[in-house]
Amino acid sequence: MISCVKKPICVLLVCFTMLSVMLTDPCATEVLAASDVTVNVSAEKQVIRGFGGMNHPAGIGDLTAAQRETAFGNGQNQLGFSILRIHVDENRNNWYREVETAKSAIKHGAIVFASPWNPPSDMVETFNRNGDTSAKRLKYDKYAAYAQHLNDFVTFMKNNGVNLYTISVQNEPDYAHEWTWWTPQEILRFMRENAGSINARVIAPESFQYLKDLSDPILNDPQALANMDILGTHLYGTQISHFPYPLFKQKGAGKDLWMTEVYYPNSDNNSADRWPEALDVSHHIHNSMVEGDFQAYVWWYIRRSYGPMKEDGTISKRGYNMAHFSKFVRPGYVRIDATKNPNANVYVSAYKGDNKVVIVAINKSSTGVNQNFVLQNGSASQVSRWITSSSSNLQPGTNLNVTGNHFWAHLPAQSVTTFVANR
């Protein structure tokens, strides 16, 4: 810690580096970042489809009208989610439950996609899986009927005002203790022989842990690959070292790569406001975008005691961490190259769209960081910013001036900041 008698030195440092008034204790230890953040506006990476979560009326009850506004609106005290995931119930008599929230999401400009847990019961058989005689799988002679079942859901939603952006073949076919198992070869067969008849974009295989043995066969089979539009996966327990997917880079041209379900770092009851634990959420999104090149990031239940929206309908600390991306990095924006780790425990990603450059900077250390940002192959005159810390939630900061294509900013200890530069 710096002695309070040295406070004038802190103030001078702020002045000389064009920093605004710090939101943390002015006597707290501050460091100068080890390196600049260089944002190369012309170095384009993946197109971002959006950020969002799951609504599951059959499981935990539907979102209320007010909660839909909080989830999909992009005003003050709203999350700005641009993706909604819904459930394909095996019983078509329950499909109506998905309509109202999906229509609200569409009204706000979000995209809606659907994932099934089970086929209709008459299409399922039990089998012996490693001693479990109650394990379920799709009957081999029902693959075409199952594709039609998915088509029927697409048609039902369309007739009720919801054009699904895409539909999945199966939720977590490799972790199906309570739903339907698929082996890699079964998924491959369906993708090759039946997925082409589905009247929507197709997501597969939605592994629970990004296990490549489920998706490699699809990528290596030209017909199956032609019938897959989006490679979707979940990231439960997936190590960051497994986020990159070289085979997808090699074979997946023209295909999207989505992270379609996760909660992180845990699902502890009433954990959504824990701090600084909630910073793990923005850090996980950062790694998904930068290390995994994912184009979508979808949370599990939108409303849950460990989710982005608490049971009372208010936004949690985890939700505000998501909002640092979802409110500012809008569908169609493109991730651009940026120095991803300019200082210990500082993580940066950058995006562009609508004549803006959006930078999300996470400081997980217990020390504030004075960071220089350099815009390369692009220019701006002023930068707006929003900060979430232990004591603030998406709090607007003072605007920062850009001089010679660079600006200085203070990253408070244990905080996330989103910067928006109008080009």
Give, region by region, the residue ranges found by the protein language model.
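Substrate-binding cleft and catalytic face of glycoside hydrolase catalytic domains
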Residues: T38-S42, G75-L219
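Aromatic/acidic polysaccharide-binding cleft in carbohydrate-active enzymes
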Residues: D256-V329, I336-A344
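Carbohydrate-binding surface patches
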Residues: N341-S381, Q414
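N-terminal module-boundary/linker segments of secreted carbohydrate-active enzymes
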Residues: V31-T70
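C-terminal beta-strand-rich structural cap/linker in extracellular carbohydrate-active enzymes
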Residues: T398-R423
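C-terminal segment of classical bacterial N-terminal signal peptides
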Residues: L19-E30
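Noncatalytic carbohydrate-binding groove/subsite architecture in carbohydrate-active enzymes
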Residues: T180-H284
